[in-house]
């Protein structure tokens, strides 16, 4: 009964919200769980780990197209001592498979995120509306509104930079936000040097990330697959090529701000960007003149 109560408590929050809210920071209560059966559900994992302590958040990563488990996830315990209890047990078996729990290590050298990418933004949303919505989370340092060079109209995304990281944590507690007339997705803008580091770490995997389903110029849904072409301040892998994030390199290096170089679970890559966008892809236009040279330093998760 106690385990079920603990599970019901975490249902009050969006799955993974507490884990994602501090993804780039060390938290002694967080664990990475690899080697999961594709049949293992969030409930199964939570109930199993609850015997070691109260679980306050749990998420299993899935392929955005098929919905199939990628074979790994993250869990957050209320008490860091629970992590030690898990690690004291040398062997863990769930749904007929040996699973691989490890401490979640924040990537070294990463600054707390202060900049977010907002995807799915209606070009009709005024700058004042954007300021009003995002300003409610904290003090804004800068807003970047990229333009389409051909139409001279706003593109369907923007970047928000805050003066500190706390507003970003609050924003990430919910993946989707209703802004103006559209439902938008929020992602952290990742420094380019960290992205490069992750790519170097992943070279030993089963092919490059762009060699996934369809590759960088592979199967797309309309123009959405290439909406970053010409927006050269950002990596194509993160914005334009939704299919490039599937398959290919299976290392866990850098997933969600954690370093798991060399762990090759599952048959799906976890991607570098917006692999999970669907119907809104064609909204984002074609080319852009960007929004300032400081954009050169970022790449979203």
UniProtKB/Swiss-Prot annotation:
Regions of compositional bias (Gly residues) in chain numbering: 204-223
Ranges where the record places region Disordered: 194-229, 279-301
Post-translational modification: Dimethylation of Arg-289 is probably of the asymmetric type.
Residues with PTM Omega-N-methylarginine: 289
Tissue: Expressed in skeletal muscle, myoblast, myotube, heart, brain, liver, kidney, heart, lung, stomach, small intestine, large intestine, spleen, and testis (at protein level). Expressed in brain, skeletal muscle, heart, lung, liver, stomach, small intestine, large intestine, kidney, spleen and testis.
Cross-link (Glycyl lysine isopeptide (Lys-Gly) (interchain with G-Cter in SUMO2)), chain numbering: 90
Cell compartments where the protein resides: Nucleus; Cytoplasm
Primary location class: nucleus
GO molecular function terms listed in the Swiss-Prot or TrEMBL record: DNA binding; RNA binding
UniProtKB keywords: Acetylation, Activator, Cytoplasm, DNA-binding, Isopeptide bond, Methylation, Nucleus, Phosphoprotein, Repeat, Repressor, RNA-binding, Transcription, Transcription regulation, Ubl conjugation
SMART domains: RRM
Positions of the UniProt region annotated as Necessary for interaction with TNPO1: 223-301
Residues modified to N6-methyllysine: 42
GO BP terms, alphabetized: mRNA metabolic process
Residues bearing the modification Dimethylated arginine: 289
Domain RRM intervals: 29-111, 114-193
Phosphoserine sites (modified residues): 122
Entries under InterPro entries matching the protein: hnRPDL_RRM1, Nucleotide-bd_a/b_plait_sf, RBD_domain_sf, RRM_dom
One annotated Gene Ontology cellular component of this protein: cytoplasm
Record PTM N6-acetyllysine, positions in chain: 97
Function: Acts as a transcriptional regulator. Promotes transcription repression. Promotes transcription activation in differentiated myotubes. Binds to double- and single-stranded DNA sequences. Binds to the transcription suppressor CATR sequence of the COX5B promoter. Binds with high affinity to RNA molecules that contain AU-rich elements (AREs) found within the 3'-UTR of many proto-oncogenes and cytokine mRNAs. Binds both to nuclear and cytoplasmic poly(A) mRNAs. Binds to poly(G) and poly(A), but not to poly(U) or poly(C) RNA homopolymers. Binds to the 5'-ACUAGC-3' RNA consensus sequence.
Record text on subunit structure and interactions: Interacts with TNPO1. Interacts with ZNF148.
Matching PANTHER family: HETEROGENEOUS NUCLEAR RIBONUCLEOPROTEIN D-LIKE, RNA-BINDING (RRM/RBD/RNP MOTIFS) FAMILY PROTEIN
Protein name per its UniProtKB record: Heterogeneous nuclear ribonucleoprotein D-like
Gene: Hnrnpdl
């Amino acid at each position: 009964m106690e385990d079920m109560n603990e599970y019901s408590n975490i249902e009050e929050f969006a799955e993974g919200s507490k884990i994602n809210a501090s993804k780039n920071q060390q938290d002694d209560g967080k664990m990475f769980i690899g080697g999961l059966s594709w049949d293992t559900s969030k409930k199964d994992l939570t109930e199993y780990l609850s015997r070691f302590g109260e679980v306050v958040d749990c998420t299993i990563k899935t392929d955005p197209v098929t919905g199939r488990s990628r074979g790994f996830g993250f869990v957050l315990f209320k008490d860091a001592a629970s992590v030690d209890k898990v690690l004291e047990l040398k062997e863990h078996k769930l749904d007929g498979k040996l699973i691989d729990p490890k401490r979640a290590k924040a990537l070294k050298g990463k600054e707390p995120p202060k900049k977010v990418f907002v995807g799915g933004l209606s070009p009709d949303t005024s700058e004042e509306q954007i300021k009003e919505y995002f300003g409610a989370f904290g003090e804004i340092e800068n807003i970047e509104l990229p333009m389409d060079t051909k139409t001279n109209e706003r593109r369907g995304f923007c970047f928000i930079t805050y003066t500190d990281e706390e507003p970003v944590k609050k924003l990430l507690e919910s993946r989707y936000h209703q802004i103006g007339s559209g439902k938008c997705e929020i992602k952290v803008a990742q420094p380019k040097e960290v992205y490069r580091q992750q790519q170097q770490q992943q070279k030993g995997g089963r092919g490059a990330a762009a060699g996934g389903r369809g590759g960088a110029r592979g199967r797309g849904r309309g123009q959405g697959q290439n909406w970053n072409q010409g927006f050269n301040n950002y990596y194509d892998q993160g914005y334009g090529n939704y299919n490039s994030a599937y398959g290919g390199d299976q290392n866990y290096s850098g997933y969600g701000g954690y370093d798991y170089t060399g762990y090759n679970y599952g048959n799906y890559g976890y991607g570098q960007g917006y692999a999970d966008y669907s119907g809104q892809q064609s909204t984002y236009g074609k080319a852009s003149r960007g929004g300032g040279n400081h954009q050169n330093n970022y790449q979203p998760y």
